[in-house]
């Protein structure tokens, strides 16, 4: 199965000034696209060629895993942001967040701290556990909840290419801006349901 670069769920300049058109041109158009091209090349003539992306992620390793997981992670990540994002979750997700951390403010502080402290390149996730509770999980490199029993609700990309054009080495500022101005709680709530 030939994989293609999924379109962004908004215009390429829709997240400005918090995430620039230039960042998305590089991050989506070059980095995300490179994972697609790499996977298509790596899977040729293998058992993975006929599999869907999520199946490849669960059954592969090495370069095929890294590229397939990065395709999925990035596609998921784009939907975790929206123009005029921010705010707080509602409904069942808000209740789960409050049950775990006591308040949205405490959750936000914990999420930003976890993302800032995620050493090197990786992802910080809000996940739903098998028992219905929520937690914050860091993964390194191409790590993804798809290979665990956790269900991904929300993620922030903390690879430097995700924020370096706009934020340089200020990962804390990127993480704080993501939570206050970009996060798409509607998407996370739909994933929690």
Language-model segments: residues:
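Feature for soluble, non-membrane regions of globular proteins
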Residues: 1-193
